């Protein structure tokens, strides 16, 4: 309890409120006594525990609180007294003689506590014989045992009478102040978040047909509250809901009860229900409930999830929504009694759907707050002694049980529960997780619910199925209009969404850029004089120059020329180029230098500018001659090599300009460091391909090579932009891939992506041969063990995926919310060529990736401005995709040669992730487009922005005739993409489709088609037999 902070202002207000109210409690008690023994985590809703939390904000075990009209006595240990004494002293000083709080210290000394209890009993007896108690509370411990002995003696000796004050306490706690209402909002939002998590896990289990029990699924959700990564996500959302001056503290967030999941066939709609141990049934109705408490203030939410529901289920669920709305908006009003509320709900059912009244719950909720379910204020037809007040908070829970589907006969139940706060403005629902039928209904089986009628033998006519069969030719003829209408509707929705995305893109572009963002075409780029020095002082010049010969100083990047008997240094950066030639007995070398205004100034020379001034004089060239030809050739070679070295070093500096120096990796010195062994890394710091180990440390991860201790890669969590886990399904390797915010150095190489992988399978060898030696050598890979081998392979792959997934999640958890694991969706992938070869690209939640073959592809979708689909033409088998980024200085990303069959899917995917796209029939010159855009982005958007690409949009492409497209000869860098399709290029399905469309009007043409070889051979054989008999 080292971090206990008690709000003594709240303590004072609530203690005085208790002092003022308790004489009017049932039984008219003259004093109150509440004793708490050892903490009971299994039952946190006992009245004495709630009183501690209401007064102090904490539960103080082994503590007794006695309240009188003139004061209060607290008996507790010396350790707990330290948290109270300073605040209590200030309260006593403030209250003076009107009310006094006394702190009595208990101890473990024999007889000490008995003496305190006897003194207290004497005070109680003096106050009066009626003593208010929480008679239903049950605590254990030595402190309780000692008190019971003294109390029982006092009852017999002094005639003290204990009266139950549970109802009085309930009425005192019913109305919530602003602080309590804020805590209820925090806990309710927490319930929403955990219900969202529960629904995701539930739907995934049903969709993937995972074999799991209701209780096990409940445990999985319950354990999420212990994961810091999940809790840190909650902090930004829950902090604004906290009372003024308080910060959200995850340590005070806890379950009010274990999550409840019920998938039938039996349901329990009581708050005491438990998740069953039966397998999760993914049909019909699944009931789910979550309850979170923050600083001991409880909230509750229950939802019904409909899985492939019948019309009757959905109709009854819609009525349940209306019933809950009726209770909250019309029946739950200030001054109403629980009986009036419940009877009003029953009357509503009888007037609308009387057949449901038999299965209606026995109550529609209860008062809640520090106590999850206040038994003194249950909303049923028996409670007419309490009235709803402004400031009350209720768990409105209702449902129908023991329902039977008239079509299938299956049993099901429906339930809804929400936390509702009564405010001056009316009821306010604090739990906002969706309950709309469209959002909680899931359809995994699209086939007919009814059974197929058996066709009678007399009937020769086949009936048309109510749903088109994908394998039936009826799909492509009679029922073609059904699927086409559905596709047209989806297309219209997609076009409307794209129109909104383009309008949003144009608005944001105009807001993002102003006139000042434009570059002045007449203005030359501002250059900065690059200073360099060969020597600061003359004493640094080498002594060898005394011989008045040409010298090259490699250390200082300088060559020294003798001019008029003096050594003159020239830095290599001032040297431009040179030449050497021989004339007669002399060898000449000409040295050219950089200077401003030199004709033919290139981009490279501008990178080494000088300060241009009339006062400055420059040497543009020098010519030296000597009879020592070998010496001059050697000098010229050294100067040339020095220049090459300088240029190379400058280029490396430019390449590494965006490399940010990382902080040091803080190694984990305490506890066990998580590690993953036998890991290969790409790119590798070693020349040899050897497996190493990855460690998770305090602020990052480290890959350590086994060859050398200094051969390692350190990656800080703060520099991780994306963390991907890609399982080995459909691949030969399992991958953990890290995409960095800023590149890091590996030796002298700059890297932006680091990948850890392990091969998923060993080489399998199968040899034929009957030799005993061969059979022994390859006995596990023979034909007779093929099934066993495949099963073993699947098991290994599953274990490998599990190991890597756990390690990736461990990395994310160790980052304290800085990193999240992203997974690719293989079912949404497509083939493309982002670099040199065709690869399989897959979307993730936030990116489009290709991680199997280097160079890797990682496109962060949040950074994409627009996507352009190029070379979309009739007759072409593939198209290209270009991503333009919001940072216009960043090069665009190309993914070429995507199969044309993926076009509609990619359009839908781009729309789903809110990326606007346009369609073009040609490849665009992106270097020119991006340069003009960077020159004046404001004018670009004033002129319509990306609308200039709309000439190839879906609307226009749909109206383009086949002749118009065929007349255009596309200019493509890859002519192989535009070869004329042969007959083999058309699929069998396409031929069927064309023939089916014309089957009614041109059925007579089938006889004119050529016959296949089998038919011709049969005819030839028949003709031969006929000729033989004729002979």
UniProtKB/Swiss-Prot annotation:
Show the ranges annotated as biased composition (Acidic residues).
Answer: 953-1015
> Any coiled-coil ranges, and where?
478-499
What GO molecular functions are on record for this protein? histone binding; histone chaperone activity; nucleosome binding
Taxonomy, superkingdom: Eukaryota
InterPro entries registered for this protein in UniProt = Creatin/AminoP/Spt16_N, Creatinase/aminopeptidase-like, FACT-SPT16_Nlobe, Fact-SPT16_PH, FACT_SPT16_C, FACT_SPT16_M, Pept_M24, PH-like_dom_sf
Stretches of Basic and acidic residues bias are at: 450-460, 491-501, 1016-1031
Q: Where is the signal peptide?
A: none
Keyword DNA repair annotated: yes
A Gene Ontology cellular-component term? FACT complex
Span list, region Disordered: 450-501, 952-1031
Major localisation: nucleus
Any GO BP: transcription elongation by RNA polymerase II
**Record keywords, A-Z:** Chromosome, Coiled coil, DNA damage, DNA repair, DNA replication, Nucleus, Transcription, Transcription regulation
Where, subcellularly, is it found?
Nucleus; Chromosome
Q: Assembly state and interactors?
A: Forms a stable heterodimer with POB3. The SPT16-POB3 dimer weakly associates with multiple molecules of NHP6 to form the FACT complex.
- Family assignment? Belongs to the peptidase M24 family. SPT16 subfamily.
User: What name does UniProt use for this protein?
Assistant: FACT complex subunit SPT16
Phylogenetic lineage: Eukaryota, Fungi, Dikarya, Ascomycota, Saccharomycotina
């Amino acid at each position: 309890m080292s971090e206990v902070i008690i709000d003594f202002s709240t303590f004072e207000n609530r203690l005085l409120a208790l002092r003022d109210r308790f004489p009017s409690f049932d039984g008219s008690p003259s004093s109150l006594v509440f004793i708490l023994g050892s903490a009971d985590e299994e039952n946190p809703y006992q009245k004495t525990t709630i009183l501690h939390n209401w007064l102090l904000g904490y539960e103080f075990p082994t503590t007794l609180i006695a309240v009188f009209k003139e004061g209060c006595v607290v008996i507790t240990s010396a350790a707990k007294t330290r948290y109270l004494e300073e605040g209590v002293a200030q309260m006593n000083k403030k209250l003076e003689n009107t009310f006094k709080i006394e702190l009595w210290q208990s101890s473990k000394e024999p007889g000490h506590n008995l003496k305190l209890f006897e003194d207290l009993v004497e005070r109680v007896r003096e106050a009066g014989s009626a003593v208010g108690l929480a008679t239903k509370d049950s605590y254990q411990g030595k402190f309780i045992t000692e008190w019971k002995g003294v109390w029982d003696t006092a009852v017999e000796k002094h005639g003290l009478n204990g009266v139950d004050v549970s109802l009085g306490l309930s009425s005192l706690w019913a109305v919530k102040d602003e602080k309590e209402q804020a805590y209820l909002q925090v806990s309710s939002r927490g319930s929403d978040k955990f219900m969202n998590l529960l629904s995701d896990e539930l739907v995934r289990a049903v969709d993937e047909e995972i074999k799991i029990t209701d209780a096990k699924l409940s445990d999985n959700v319950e354990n999420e509250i212990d994961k810091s990564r999940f809790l840190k996500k909650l902090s930004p959302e829950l902090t604004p809901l906290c009372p003024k001056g308080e910060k959200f503290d995850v340590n005070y967030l806890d379950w009010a009860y274990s999550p409840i999941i019920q998938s039938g066939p039996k349901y329990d709609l009581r708050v005491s229900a438990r998740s069953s141990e039966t397998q999760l049934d993914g049909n019909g109705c699944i009931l789910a409930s979550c309850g979170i408490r923050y600083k001991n203030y409880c909230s509750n939410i229950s939802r019904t999830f409909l899985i492939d529901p019948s019309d009757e289920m959905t109709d009854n669920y819609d009525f349940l929504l209306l019933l809950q709305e009726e209770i909250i908006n019309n029946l739950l009003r200030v001054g109403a009694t629980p009986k009036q509320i419940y009877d009003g709900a029953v009357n509503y059912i009888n007037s609308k759907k009387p057949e449901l009244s038999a299965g209606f719950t026995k109550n529609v909720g209860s008062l809640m707050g520090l106590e999850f379910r206040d038994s003194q204020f249950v909303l049923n037809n028996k409670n007419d002694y309490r009235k709803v007040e402004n400031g009350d908070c209720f768990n409105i829970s209702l449902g129908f049980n023991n329902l039977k589907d008239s079509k299938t006969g299956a049993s099901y139940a429906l339930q809804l529960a929400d936390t509702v706060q009564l405010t001056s403005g009316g009821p306010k629902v604090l739990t906002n997780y969706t309950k709309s039928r469209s959002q909680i209904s899931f359809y995994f089986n699209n086939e007919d619910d009814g059974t197929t009628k058996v066709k009678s033998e007399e009937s020769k006519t086949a009936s048309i199925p109510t749903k088109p069969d994908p394998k039936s030719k009826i799909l492509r003829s009679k029922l073609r209009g059904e699927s086409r209408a559905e596709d047209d509707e989806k297309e219209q929705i997609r076009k409307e969404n794209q129109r909104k995305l383009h309008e949003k893109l144009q608005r944001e572009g105009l807001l993002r850029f102003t006139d000042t963002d434009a570059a002045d075409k007449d203005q030359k780029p501002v250059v900065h004089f690059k200073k360099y020095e060969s020597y600061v002082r003359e004493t640094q010049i080498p002594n060898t120059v005394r011989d008045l010969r040409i010298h090259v100083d490699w250390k200082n990047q300088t060559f020294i020329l003798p001019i008029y008997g003096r050594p003159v240094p020239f830095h290599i950066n001032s040297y431009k180029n040179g030449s050497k030639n021989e004339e007669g007995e002399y060898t000449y070398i000409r040295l050219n230098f950089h200077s401003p205004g030199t004709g033919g100034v290139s981009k490279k020379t501008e990178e080494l500018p000088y300060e241009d001034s009339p006062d400055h004089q420059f040497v543009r060239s020098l010519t030296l001659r000597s009879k020592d030809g070998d010496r001059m050739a050697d000098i010229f070679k050294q100067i040339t090599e020095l220049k090459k070295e300088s240029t190379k070093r400058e280029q490396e500096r430019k390449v590494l300009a965006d490399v940010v120096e990382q902080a040091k990796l803080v190694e984990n010195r305490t506890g066990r460091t998580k590690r993953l062994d036998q890991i290969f890394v790409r790119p590798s710091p070693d020349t040899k391909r050897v497996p190493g180990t990855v460690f998770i440390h305090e602020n990052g991860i480290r890959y350590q090579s086994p060859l050398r201790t200094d051969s390692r890669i350190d990656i800080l969590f703060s520099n991780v932009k994306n963390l991907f886990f890609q399982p080995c399904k459909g691949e030969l390797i399992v991958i953990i891939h890290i995409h960095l915010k800023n590149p890091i150095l590996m030796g002298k190489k700059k890297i932006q992506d680091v990948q850890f992988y392990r091969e998923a399978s060993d080489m399998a060898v199968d040899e034929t041969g009957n030799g005993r030696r061969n059979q022994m050598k390859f006995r596990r890979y023979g034909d007779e063990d093929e099934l066993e081998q495949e099963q073993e392979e699947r098991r290994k792959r599953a274990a490998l995926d599990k190991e890597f997934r756990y390690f990736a999640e461990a990395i994310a958890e160790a980052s304290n919310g800085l990193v999240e694991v992203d997974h690719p969706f293989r079912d949404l992938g497509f083939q493309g060529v982002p670099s040199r070869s065709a690869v399989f690209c897959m979307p993730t939640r936030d990116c489009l990736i290709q991680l199997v073959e280097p160079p890797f592809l990682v496109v962060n979708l949040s950074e994409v401005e627009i996507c352009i689909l190029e070379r979309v033409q009739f007759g072409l088998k593939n198209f290209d995709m270009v991503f333009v980024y919001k940072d216009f200085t960043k090069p665009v990303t190309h993914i070429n040669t995507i199969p044309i069959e993926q076009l509609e899917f990619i359009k839908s995917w781009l729309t789903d992730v809110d990326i606007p796209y346009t369609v073009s029939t040609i490849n665009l010159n992106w270097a020119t487009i991006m340069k003009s855009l960077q020159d004046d982005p404001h004018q670009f958007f004033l002129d319509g922005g990306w609308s200039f690409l709309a000439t190839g949009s879906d609307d226009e492409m749909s109206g383009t005739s086949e002749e118009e497209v065929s007349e255009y000869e596309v200019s493509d860098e890859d002519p192989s993409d535009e070869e004329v399709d042969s007959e083999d290029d058309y699929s069998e399905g396409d031929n069927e489709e064309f023939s089916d469309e014309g089957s009614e009007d041109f059925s007579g043409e089938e006889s004119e088609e050529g016959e296949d070889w089998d038919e011709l051979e049969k005819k030839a054989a028949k003709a031969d037999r006929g000729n033989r008999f004729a002979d």
